[in-house]
Amino acid sequence: MIPENILHTSISHLRGVGAQRAELLKTELGIYEYQDLLNLFPNRYIDRTKFYKINELQNNNAEVQLVGKIVNLRTVESAHQKSNRLVATFVDETGTMELVWFKGLKWLRDSLKINEPYVIFGKLNFFGGTFSMPHPEMDLLSEFKKTGHSSIQPVYPSTEKLAKRNITNRVMRQLVQTVFEEIGYNFSENLPDTILTTMNLISKREAMRNIHFPTNQSLLTKASIRLKFEELFYIQVQLVLKNLLHKQKFQGQPFKKVGDAFMNFYNHHLPFPLTNAQKRVLKEIRADVGSNAQMNRLLQGDVGSGKTIVALMTMLLAVDNRCQACLMAPTEILANQHYQTISELLKNTGVTVALLTGSSKTKERRILDEQLQSGELSILIGTHALLEEKVQFQNLGLAIIDEQHRFGVEQRAKLWRKNTIPPHILVMTATPIPRTLAMSVYGDLDVSVIDELPPGRKPIKTLHQYENRRAETYEFIKREIDKGRQAYVVYPLIEESEALDFKNLTEGYEYITASFPLPKYKVSIVHGKLKPAEKDAEMERFLRNETQIMVATTVIEVGVNVPNASVMVIESAERFGLSQLHQLRGRVGRGSEQSYCILLTGNKMSNETRIRMETMVRTNDGFEIAEVDLKLRGPGDLMGTQQSGVLALKIADLVKDQDILKAARFQAIDLLKADPNLELPQNQRIAYTLNQLQRHKNLWTYIS
C-alpha cells in the first residue's frame, strides 16, 4: 500500500523534473502531483515488436523501427546558421537511408557512435528517391537489450509548448517510470473483491503497470477495462449516493389523494387516450409524489410524444392535495403556448390557471400575486419571471421546468425556496438525451422516458435536396398551401457572415415574397432581433392562418405548435446540428395530415454533414438521432459548456464504453441498495476512496 502523502508529493520533487519543467507540466497538462502524472493515461500505443529492413520500407509507413549502423555524419550548412542540419547515413544489410536533426547538433555529433549498432524509431519521410527519418528515437542495441524496452510503448498527451521545450514522449515515459520506482509499484486496491470477481477485473496494481508499460496486448486490454470501469463506477456511486441522500434529506409534500381534479380531467376532458408510455410515466411520477421524499425526476419525450398532458395531470395531483403547481418555460412564446394549451384543456373544470412573463402588466401582476398568496390560483405558467422574489405562493407543491438545460442551477434552486417544504421537481426535455449521457450527467435524477407517439400521427417524410432544386421545393409548398396548409422556411443566420456562405434571412424573405406574391400569399418573418411583442404578433398571425409561410431563424425551434403547418424547409441545413434539425422538424407533423421536412444544402458536403442528412432522412426517432449526434460531436459538445466539466473523463469514453458504463451503474446501484451508508467491512475501500475524492476534488472534477 502506498502512503497517502507520497502520491500527493509535488511534481517538482520528482527526479528529472525541476522547477521549469514542473511549471510547464502544471500549465500544459495539469500535473501538480505524482498522482496527476500516474493518472495521465496514454492516448495511444506504438507497437515496437516489429523491426523493418530498409528494403521493406514503403511510402505509406507511418512509424517504423529498424536496427542498423551510422556510417557517416555530416553537417549541411545553410545561409542562416540556425537552419543548419546534421545528416547521418544509416545502413543495414539491405540498404541505406538518412537520419536528420535540426537542433542539438553539437551534442549529437559528440554523442553518436559510428559503426555501432543502433535501434532507431520514428516517422518516415520520402523525398528524391530516399527515405529519411527526422529526429529519430535512438538506443544503442546493447542498451536497448539491457533496458528490456516494452514491446508496446505508450504515447502520452502533449502540447506544442512541451515539444518545443524538449519534453518529448520519451521524457514523459521516463518520468512515469521514475514515479513507479519511487512508489515501489504498490497501489492500494479501491474496488471490493466481490466486484473484481463478478466483473472479472485485474487488480489496481496490475492495471496501473500495464496501462503505462504493457507487457502484451491482452494485459493492456484488461488494464484499460479495469481503469475505465473504476472511473465510471466512482462517478455512478457519487450520483446514486446523491440521489439517495436527496431522498433522505428533502421531504416533499406527499400527494396521497387522487381526487376530483385529476379524475374529472381523466374521465371527461382528456383529448385522446393516453399511450402506454404516458401511463407508465404517470405511474412512476405518482409513486414519487406519493412517498414522503421530494421528487427529482427527468422526463424525456420526443417531439409530440405528449409530455404536456403528463405534466398537466401531475399538476392536477398537486391541486387534489391542496397544493399549487407552476410550469416554467425558457421563452415567452413557449410559456404562452403552454398557457393556451393548458387553459383550453382545463376549460370548464374549475381549475384556475394564470400566465406570468416579463411582459405581464403591473395591474395583472398585482391581481395574480393576491390570488397566488390566497391560494385562489392553482396553476401558474411562466418564464423565469416566476423566480422573482415577489412571486410568493401560498403552498407550492410542484415545480415543472421545461427544457431545463436552458436554466442555470441557481435559477432552479430559486424555485426550491418558494416553500418551506421544497416542491416536487419534474424536469422536462424534448431534446432526447442518449442513455449513456443521461446516466452520467443526470445520474442523480430519476429518469422517465415517453418512447411512444400518440396513435394516428403520420410519420414526417424527410427529403434531402440540393439548393439548385429550390424552385421545385417552392412549387411543392404552393401545392400544400392550395390544400389549406402552411409552411416554415428556416434560415441559420440573421446577418450574412463573411467567413461562411450562409443564406441571409432578409434576402431569403425578399426572395420568398417575390416567389409567393400578394394577395394570394402572405408571409410572416420571425427572428431574434424582433421585440417579444413583435415576435408574438407574427407568431399569432401564423397560428391564425392569416399568413401561409413563416420565414424564421431557429427561434421557432422549441415548442411552437401550429397543427396546420405541414412543410418545414431548412435552408443551409449543413449549418445545423442533428439535434437542432430534429427539433425544427418537430414543428410540423402535429396535425393528422401528412407532413414534410425538406433539407436544402449546397452540393459540397463534408462526410459528417452527409451522415447528418442521411440520419434525418432515415429515421424520426429522436433517441436514435441523439446517439448518432453523440458519436459525431462527443459528450462535451452535446451538453454545451455548462455540462462539459461533468464529462472530463481521464480514460473512459462515453461513446465507446457504453457497456462498461451500464455495468458500472448496475454495480453502484446494487451495492448502495444493500449498504447505502457504506458501513459494511467489505465496502470500506469504497468509503475511503470516496473520502479521498471529496478531499482532492481537483483530481476528479468530472464527478458532479
For the regions a protein language model found, what residue spans apply to each?
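Conserved pre-motif I regulatory segment
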Residues: 23-24, 253-299
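OB-fold nucleic-acid-binding modules
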Residues: 40-67, 71
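N-terminal cationic and glycine-rich segments that engage phosphates or anionic surfaces
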Residues: 140-144, 398, 414-416, 427, ...
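Inter-lobe coupling/hinge segments of SF2-like helicase ATPases
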Residues: 283, 294-614, 674
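Accessory helical-bundle/CTD segments and flexible terminal tails appended to RecA-like ATPase motors
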Residues: 540-550, 556-563, 568-571, 586, ...
